[in-house]
Amino acid sequence: MDLPGPIHDFLLVFLGSGLLVGGLGVVLLPNPIFSAFSLGFVLVCISLLYILSNSHFVAAAQLLIYVGAINVLIIFAVMFMNDSEYSTDLNLWTVGNGITSLVCTTILFSLMSTILDTSWYGVIWTTRLNQILEQDLISNSQQIGIHLSTDFFLPFELISIILLVALIGAISMARQ
C-alpha cells in the first residue's frame, strides 16, 4: 500500500503488537480452542502485513490456505478430541519436552546467527537483475514465480516451513 510514513509505521507497529499478543495467546492460553482461535488471529495479522508490504498474492494465499483451511482443520481437530486426555495428564514437563525445547532453541540460535552473519548484497543484486527480465514476460504466473524466488523468497520459505511443521504435527497426532 502506498500510505504516508506515519500511518504506515503505525499500522506496522499495530500489526506487530497483534502478532505478539496472538503468539502469546497461542502459547499461554490453557484452552486449546482459544489457542486455535489465537493462531487464526496471528495468521490474519501476517496476511495484513503482506498487504501492507504490497504483496497481495502472498496475502491472499495466506488467507485462503492457512486461515481458511489449516486453521479451520486445527479447530475441528481440537473440538473433536476427547477433553479427558487433557485433564488426566498431570505430568506437565517430560524429558522429551526438554530435549525438544533444547533442539528448537539450538535451531533458533543457529538460524539467528546465520541470518546475521550472511551478506545479503548478492540477493539484492539478483533482485535488481530480475527486474530487467520482468519487463519481457507476458504471463502473470511467470512474474509471480520470479517474485517468489527473488523479492519474496524469505516469506515464501517461512510459509513452507510452517506448512512442514503442520504436516509433521498432523502425522504425530495421527500416530497417537
Curated annotation (Swiss-Prot):
<dbReference type="InterPro" id="IPR042106">
    <property type="entry name" value="Nuo/plastoQ_OxRdtase_6_NuoJ"/>
</dbReference>
<comment type="function">
    <text>NDH shuttles electrons from NAD(P)H:plastoquinone, via FMN and iron-sulfur (Fe-S) centers, to quinones in the photosynthetic chain and possibly in a chloroplast respiratory chain. The immediate electron acceptor for the enzyme in this species is believed to be plastoquinone. Couples the redox reaction to proton translocation, and thus conserves the redox energy in a proton gradient.</text>
</comment>
<feature type="transmembrane region" description="Helical">
    <location>
        <begin position="10"/>
        <end position="30"/>
    </location>
</feature>
<keyword id="KW-1278">Translocase</keyword>
<protein>
    <recommendedName>
        <fullName>NAD(P)H-quinone oxidoreductase subunit 6, chloroplastic</fullName>
        <ecNumber>7.1.1.-</ecNumber>
    </recommendedName>
</protein>
<dbReference type="InterPro" id="IPR001457">
    <property type="entry name" value="NADH_UbQ/plastoQ_OxRdtase_su6"/>
</dbReference>
<keyword id="KW-0793">Thylakoid</keyword>
<keyword id="KW-0150">Chloroplast</keyword>
<dbReference type="InterPro" id="IPR050290">
    <property type="entry name" value="NAD(P)H-Q_Oxidoreduct_6"/>
</dbReference>
<keyword id="KW-0618">Plastoquinone</keyword>
<keyword id="KW-1133">Transmembrane helix</keyword>
<feature type="transmembrane region" description="Helical">
    <location>
        <begin position="152"/>
        <end position="172"/>
    </location>
</feature>
<dbReference type="Pfam" id="PF00499">
    <property type="entry name" value="Oxidored_q3"/>
</dbReference>
<dbReference type="GO" id="GO:0009535">
    <property type="term" value="C:chloroplast thylakoid membrane"/>
</dbReference>
<keyword id="KW-0813">Transport</keyword>
<keyword id="KW-0521">NADP</keyword>
<keyword id="KW-0934">Plastid</keyword>
<feature type="transmembrane region" description="Helical">
    <location>
        <begin position="32"/>
        <end position="52"/>
    </location>
</feature>
<comment type="subunit">
    <text>NDH is composed of at least 16 different subunits, 5 of which are encoded in the nucleus.</text>
</comment>
<keyword id="KW-0520">NAD</keyword>
<keyword id="KW-0812">Transmembrane</keyword>
<keyword id="KW-0472">Membrane</keyword>
<feature type="transmembrane region" description="Helical">
    <location>
        <begin position="61"/>
        <end position="81"/>
    </location>
</feature>
<keyword id="KW-0874">Quinone</keyword>
<dbReference type="GO" id="GO:0048038">
    <property type="term" value="F:quinone binding"/>
</dbReference>
<feature type="transmembrane region" description="Helical">
    <location>
        <begin position="92"/>
        <end position="112"/>
    </location>
</feature>
<comment type="similarity">
    <text>Belongs to the complex I subunit 6 family.</text>
</comment>
<dbReference type="GO" id="GO:0008137">
    <property type="term" value="F:NADH dehydrogenase (ubiquinone) activity"/>
</dbReference>
